[in-house]
A protein has these predicted regions:
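Structural and coupling elements of P-loop NTPases
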Residues: 1-333
Length: 333
């Protein structure tokens, strides 16, 4: 069992966009998330036979009874317009990058775009099995790019040069990567006990900067409980005032379940996102079309308000079909 906050109640449908530099493994993460949710995609197993993603991919799935829409955005700058449409429609973005700073040259541009959209986002450091230097150096490089403070949720565990697991900073539990996207609990290696304590203290300080009650506890040298930290993490991540950082290897199925559980706990729901974007309440349906394909016969849209049912008429000239982004699917012919 992967360390996580207390079981969350079933939420309404939510949506996330996966963005990242070309070659970061973003599409592999998309497929790993879908597979972990029981909705595997058909794609050549041999990476050499896979084609480069050149357009938006949309997947629907459920994880622990919560419904999700996941958008896989092309990483090449030539197709950045696909990403821009997605960012206007989702609840949160996941920035996928590699642990080597030199391989993340476009990450600053992505983070800048997210700042302009005022979109909550977290970072998934992919290909953690290729980590060559210090993970602290990776975090420092990412922090230099980010306007918002990073909140490192995990630390890698190494055996020699290999990354074999991770420590969940808040729960203080360690896990070894296993088969089928699993992770088995282990004791925290003795040489990582001090770094784990330092990481926890650093995380608490980041959160205390956002909450006076938590700051007062730290000043009085009272350690906050895990429940308090999880609650503050959820509040700050959903509001976009911090950027959580997780790690794993999508190609190896490592860190996928931990990412799913963080998404389930910390991604804001549709109502929060609508309020954040100034969408007023009401019964009249409000739909944002952010992508049209098949010569206008099919569109991707985000339902911000109300409900659209099959057979609902649309304004003259509107696309003939709408594919679900959140809340409820609609197809009008």
């Amino acid at each position: 069992m992967v360390g996580s906050p207390a079981k969350a109640a079933v939420a309404g449908p939510r949506s996330v966009a996966l963005i990242g530099p070309y070659g970061s493994g973003k599409s592999t993460l998309f497929e790993a998330l879908m597979a972990a949710a029981g909705a595997p995609l058909k794609r050549p197993g041999d990476i050499r036979k896979r084609v480069v993603t050149t357009e938006l991919r949309l997947g629907h799935c459920s994880f622990l009874a919560d419904r999700w829409s996941i958008l896989d955005c092309p990483g090449s700058v030539e197709f950045s317009y696909e990403m821009e449409g997605a960012l206007a429609a989702v609840d949160l973005a996941i920035v996928v990058c590699e642990p080597t700073a030199g391989r993340a040259s476009s990450v600053p541009l992505l983070l800048k775009a997210l700042e302009e959209y005022r979109l909550p986002h977290l970072i998934f450091v992919n290909k953690i099995d290729t980590l060559a230097g210090s993970f602290d150096d990776t975090l420092a490089a990412l922090q230099a790019y980010s306007k918002y403070p990073l909140a490192a949720r995990q630390l890698p565990i190494r055996e020699g040069d290999a990354v074999t697991g991770y420590i969940d900073v808040v729960s203080g539990r360690a896990y070894r990567y296993g088969a089928n996207q699993g992770a088995e609990p282990i004791e925290i290696p003795s040489q990582l006990r001090d770094p784990e304590k330092q990481a926890l203290d650093g995380l608490a300080e980041v959160l205390a900067d956002q909450d006076d009650a938590l700051l007062e506890k730290l000043i009085e040298e009272v350690a906050p409980t895990s429940a308090e930290l999880y609650q503050q993490l959820r509040k700050d991540q959903a509001s976009g005032t911090i950027v959580e950082v997780l790690l794993g290897s999508a190609a190896r199925g490592q860190g996928i379940l931990a990412l799913w559980k963080t998404m389930r706990h910390d991604v804001p729901d549709a109502a929060e996102t609508a309020a954040h974007r100034g969408v007023g309440a009401g019964e009249v349906p409000l739909v944002q079309i952010f992508k049209t394909v098949q010569a206008g016969k099919l569109s991707y849209g985000r339902i911000w308000r109300g409900v659209l049912l099959a057979g609902t008429s649309s304004a003259p000239g509107a696309p003939r079909a709408c594919r679900q982004m959140s809340r409820q699917a609609c197809r009008s012919y």
